[in-house]
Design a protein with these regions (language model features):
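Disordered, charged N-terminal biogenesis/targeting segments of membrane/secreted proteins
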Residues: 1-31
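Single-pass transmembrane signal-anchor helices and their membrane-water interface zones
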Residues: 10-12, 33-70
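Short, charged N-terminal helix-start/capping segments
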Residues: 22, 29-38, 104-111, 267
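Alpha-helical, hydrophobic structural elements that either
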Residues: 53-345
């Protein structure tokens, strides 16, 4: 399986967690917590997380990662912009002989990537298929707010671990990806956040015995992080409703299915994500599908956005690599409808 395929699958996994999260379970918490994921989800994590991506290290780590992820080279300007919006941390903690270092993180306020270095005790080989925790990590700020919980304690996001790169026998790079679809007014760059890792596990795939996990430590690692100011910049593209054709009812976007007019009420674009809020008078409360949409850049390049969750009033889309909001000219839909970026604020 290619790195691109596994990245796509990991996004599907994140969405599974988000769907589960929106089921209404309240889990108020202000620190480390054990939120056990179902056995099926753990198995899916293990299947999808085993990949080695050839990336470089240092200040351009995320630039190299996003270039690999998107399958296209990034310009020097893109790399500089990604570097300026990357939080460099470099803090380590040791529990039961295992050192975890939070190296850096990148976010647009809706999707976040945290890069960790895991170092095992000398003489211990990190040769399992998967490392991390089968529990959602807790990320809280100084005010007690959780990155993926709303004020009532309900899930508004999800996340998962990914094995990225092996440095040497007892060192590997891990990536934790998280989505947060918190809809209230909240800034993430004006406060210090604390990332908790509650326990360390390893996992194996075995064709005969199936998948199995083993706990390496019951310790809790915690890291403070402050995101760069301006990383969560958002542009609203809609001043009045725009009508496009979509398929209602969750059916695949295909000419064989009837397409109905859907009013787009809001189109909020960030470096990694686009949130589209919509309404259909014909079938209220029914999910819509607009298929693949594109960000058309000023240089003519069309960058596809991948759907990442559909709800009765909203669709979330993802970019494979952060875009420069100042260089986006318009959003293009499958039916030819265009939402221009008239002014960027």
């Amino acid at each position: 399986m290619k790195a691109r395929d596994i990245m796509d699958a990991m996004d599907m996994l994140d969405q599974d967690l988000i769907i589960e999260a929106r089921s209404g379970r309240s889990i108020k918490s202000h620190g480390p917590r054990r939120l056990l994921i179902s056995a099926a989800v753990i198995a899916l994590v293990m299947i999808l997380a085993f990949t080695v991506v050839a990336v470089s290290y240092g200040s351009d780590w995320f630039a190299a990662f996003f270039s690999e992820r998107s399958g296209r080279p990034l310009s020097r300007e893109d790399m500089d912009r990604i570097g300026a919006n990357t939080a460099q941390v470099g803090k380590s903690q040791v529990r039961d002989g295992y050192t975890i270092t939070l190296e850096s993180a990148f976010t647009d306020g809706k999707r976040a990537f945290f890069r960790f270095l895991l170092t095992a005790p000398e003489g211990t080989a990190l040769d399992a298929d998967w490392y991390g925790s089968p529990e959602l990590s807790s990320i809280v700020n100084e005010r007690g707010e959780d990155l993926i919980l709303d004020s009532e304690g309900f899930y508004m996001g999800g996340g998962g671990w990914r094995h990225i790169h092996e440095q040497q026998e007892n060192e590997i790079t891990l990536l934790y990806t998280i989505d947060t679809f918190y809809t209230g007014e909240r800034s993430i760059s004006d406060t210090v956040w604390i990332f908790y890792i509650d326990g360390l596990w390893k996992g194996y795939r075995d064709e005969e015995e199936g998948r199995r996990t083993e706990q390496l430590s019951e310790g809790v690692w915690s890291f403070e992080i402050r995101f760069p100011e301006g990383c969560e910049r958002e542009v609203e593209l809609i001043s009045e409703p725009v009508t496009v054709l979509g398929v209602l009812g969750g059916a695949p976007l295909d000419p064989a299915y009837q397409m109905d007019p859907v009013d787009i009420l809001s189109c909020r674009m960030r470096a990694l994500t686009v949130e589209i809020y919509y309404r259909s008078e014909k079938k209220e409360g029914i999910n819509a599908d607009f298929g693949v949409i594109y960000a058309v850049m000023k240089n003519g390049e069309q960058i596809p956005l991948r759907r990442h969750g559909t709800y009765p009033d909203k669709i979330n889309y993802l970019f494979d690599a952060p875009i420069d909001l100042d260089q986006v000219e318009q959003i293009l839909f499958h039916d030819g409808t265009v939402i221009p970026v008239e002014s960027v604020s």
